Amino acid sequence: MKPSSILRSLALAAALGLAACTTVGPNYTVPNNAAARRPAAQAGFVEAQGKAISLDPLPTQWWRLYRSAELDALVEQAIAANTSLRAADAHLRSAAAWVARVDAEHDPHVGAVVAVKRARESGEAFLLPERLPVVNEGELAVQASYQLDLWGQLKRGEEAAEANLQAVEAAQDVARVSVVAQTVQAYVQICHAQAQKLVAAHALDLQERSLALAERMLEVGRGSSSEVLRSQGLVQAQRASLPRFDAERDAAFYRLAYLLGRLPQDLPASAVACATPLQLVQAVPVGDGTALLKRRPDVRQAERQLAAASARIGVATAELYPDIRLGASLGLVGIAEHLGRPATQSFGFGSLLSWHIPDAGAKARVKMAEADAQAALAQFDGVVLQAMSETETALSRYRHDLERQASLHEARDQAAALADQQKRFVEAGRHPYASSLDAQRTLANAEATLASNDEQLALDQVRLFLALGGGWETGEP
């Protein structure tokens, strides 16, 4: 065939390919029946009630609401060095490299061939009756090929790869949200363990003073041995509670070291110096359902996985249609010693159409891709519903623990008033000193219960911030 005929054939194939070019498979949008589209999912929260809750948007760096420079520094260190975040960053780079690889499929493929061999070719292969001699054969060639994306298979593949990259990026944000919340939680537990130990130590001091009084009363004949034994038991019971707070502090300390990517020995002592519980100076800003679904990275991850699954339907559907590739080669083929002579020059241009018939396997792959997309939609709906459930649950717990705290504050205040009254009565000689110590013990118990609930309330706040999905953004607060 003459070169002009070859070029005309190539031009005709390219023209037909471009004329028929289309993109098969669904054009992705979030389905109208998705849970995220429901009006209730975009409305305010049912449990967002009371003065302690604000409908203002959640700040990007919510931990700064505690106004603790030490906590801010710990969170920054965790984001920079946490091992889970380092792994997530590596996964993201891998996904980005995969996108680059898929994008390269759109480019022409160019390759070179350099070959030398000693061989005897078959005479029959060249329609020659005689036996051919043994010679050194050589080949130098440049080859190029290009796939016409007639049905959008490459385009859908790029869409799937890009959506997968975005899903991996969202997974990295999920890890960051978790690490930030766990870091704040560990620091909260350190602070509250120290504070509760101080309260327990004060109660122990009161018990020891009560024991000393009981022993003095027994010595002067105004007490009983049973009262001394009772006081001794109370002292030992109170003393036994102190190691628990040390253990809780140490456990939180070691967990904090892990979150910061450090060995326990490398964590500064200042990390456990906190003895004042963290306090929010404002209502917790929670926003609404629309902001929640946009902010939570696990929702974004599931939605991007759905987009990737939808694009893969197009990839599978394109396999039902013919595939056309254009190719060209230019080189030298012949006896190695003769390479470069006109007789060894070769070139070729052409097109290749391939079509798998029957296509039962391709149709099955389309059905598989469609089923995978349906599963991804179900997963997306599940993540949305879980996000709403976790947020409402966290709000409910926080609200009810606030109510409990109000009652405990009142009980503590009443115990404090009684202790003050008994102290004045003792000073006036109207009541024995033992009654004042009993009132002091009641006050100490009320303070211990309140301190325990304060810790629970602080952990409720952290769980609420975690449910709201904040902490992955890199912007300024």
What are these regions (language model features)?
Residues R86-A87, D103-A104, L148-R176, S226, ...:
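Sec/SRP-type N-terminal targeting helices
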